[in-house]
């Protein structure tokens, strides 16, 4: 299985409504994109200075299915909204 990890730091100017809009968009992705096998996300609970504000971990059977997710229009729409409210986004993909 491939794991896809995303972490972001929100801009100081990011509104609660904008963050909630991204979360709502993410909630719908597993029903729209059948390639998603696992999908968990949430805001940081520790809120330490070193912590990122938001994380997402998703799982895919193989690289081809992860690529279909990556280019899916519904995913791209959420990514665009996430980029608007984040100062920094980190990505990691690994086999598990």
Residue ranges and their predicted role:
Residues 70, 79-82:
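Short, flexible helix/strand-to-coil boundary loops that buttress conserved ligand/catalytic motifs
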Residues 1-53, 61-71, 94-96:
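Short S/T/G/P-rich N-terminal loop/turn motif that feeds into the first structured element of a domain
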């Amino acid at each position: 299985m491939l794991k896809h990890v995303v972490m972001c730091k929100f801009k100081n100017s990011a509104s609660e409504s904008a963050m909630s809009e991204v979360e709502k968009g993410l909630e719908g992705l597993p029903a729209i994109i059948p390639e998603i096998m696992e999908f968990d996300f949430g805001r940081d609970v520790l809120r330490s200075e070193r912590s990122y504000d938001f994380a997402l971990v998703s799982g895919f059977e193989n690289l081809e299915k992860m690529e279909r997710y990556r280019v899916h229009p519904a995913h791209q729409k959420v990514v665009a909204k996430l980029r608007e409210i984040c100062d920094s986004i980190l990505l990691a993909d690994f086999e598990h």
